């Protein structure tokens, strides 16, 4: 140690900001640590090893806080097995400050590898120092950089996969065959605020709208009134198909419709459950306001649900793709013009 200190004195310089021997020695250690960190072969090996044998874990910032990320409050999975949707969920939970996410590397194996590469010959005077420098280089420089690279790579792959799924699902949704030549009753289901109805003719023109209350909280009287109202619209406008949105109160509405149709078998009216994702977004949009200036959002939504079965493509192109709800975390992704 005395010899090292003597040699280090030559590097002490007030002008260069090296005030004493300790600073000179620490500076030398930092230089070695940076050189180790800059070795591309080391980084490649460590990244591959971490990807193969490492894991990603997450913990709650506050375990008492309720959120949609509770399954990630105490979570760990190997890097190589982590599914894309989990990566996106972890990223979002971290961004919203519910969880802390980290990459757990096989640190002992990594340090053993680095020591073998850096320390060419065992020397009782230098080996302990070099081991400390290697550990510092990994923990302070290499490790954090590798963690960022791995998480960035996983995120890129997860987003690419999510966009592919989104595009495929959206194409299938948009290319559904239209049901032409039918007068359709659009049914936007709900509980407390009532179910909004809209009848559109074969060209998509809205003929009538109303609200019925057959779902909870309700009474037999309200259910009967709802059935009578719908039967009256079927009779008046020649409705042959009822398009029911698949949102809240869908099943309850479906049961009411099934019971009602049993009462009028001669009308041969059918019903279909329709994906209503994005209908509420559209109904509050500027485009919907211009298209239906005298309707409220519920009436616009019901009209949209009816039109979706008549011509899915023409109706769905009015909605921001991120609001259609056919992918994984699509609201978190940045889309290029051809993503869908």
Please report, for each region that a protein language model flagged, where it lies by residue:
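Long, charge-rich intrinsically disordered scaffolds of nucleic-acid metabolism proteins
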Residues: 272, 283-337
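Conserved small/polar residues in nucleotide/adenosyl-binding loops
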Residues: 1-5, 335-339
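Duplex nucleic acid-engaging cores and interfaces of nucleic-acid transaction enzymes
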Residues: 3-186, 190-295, 302, 306
């Amino acid at each position: 140690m005395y010899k090292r200190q003597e040699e280090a004195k030559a590097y002490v310089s007030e002008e260069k900001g090296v005030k004493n021997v300790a600073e000179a020695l620490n500076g030398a250690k930092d230089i070695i640590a940076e050189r180790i960190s800059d070795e591309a072969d080391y980084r490649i090996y460590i990244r591959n090893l971490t990807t193969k044998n490492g894991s990603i874990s997450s913990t709650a910032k506050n375990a008492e806080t309720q959120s949609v990320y509770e399954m990630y409050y105490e979570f760990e999975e190997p890097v190589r097995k982590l599914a894309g949707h989990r990566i996106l969920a972890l990223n979002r939970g971290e961004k919203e400050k519910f969880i802390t996410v980290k990459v757990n590397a096989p640190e002992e194996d990594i340090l053993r590898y680095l020591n073998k590469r850096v320390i060419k010959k065992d020397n009782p005077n230098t080996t302990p120092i070099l081991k400390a420098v290697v550990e510092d280089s990994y923990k302070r420089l290499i490790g954090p950089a590798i963690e960022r690279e791995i998480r960035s790579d996983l995120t890129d792959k997860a987003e690419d996969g999510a966009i592919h799924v989104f595009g495929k699902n959206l194409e299938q949704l948009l290319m559904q065959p239209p049901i032409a030549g039918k007068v359709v009753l659009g049914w936007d289901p709900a509980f407390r605020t009532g179910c909004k109805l809209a009848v559109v003719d074969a060209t998509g023109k809205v003929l009538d709208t109303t609200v019925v209350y057959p779902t909870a909280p309700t009474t037999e009287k309200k259910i009967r009134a709802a059935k009578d109202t719908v039967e009256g619209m079927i009779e008046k406008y020649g409705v042959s198909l009822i398009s029911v949105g698949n949102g809240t109160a869908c099943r309850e509405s479906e049961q009411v419709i099934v019971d009602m149709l049993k009462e009028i078998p001669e009308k041969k009216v059918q019903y279909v459950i329709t994906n209503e994702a994005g209908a509420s977004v559209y109904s509050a949009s500027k485009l919907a306001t211009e298209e239906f200036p005298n309707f409220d959002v519920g009436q616009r939504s019901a009209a949209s649900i009816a039109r979706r079965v008549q011509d899915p493509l023409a109706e769905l192109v009015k909605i921001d793709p991120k609001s259609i709800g056919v992918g994984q975390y699509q609201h978190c992704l940045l889309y290029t013009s051809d993503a869908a």
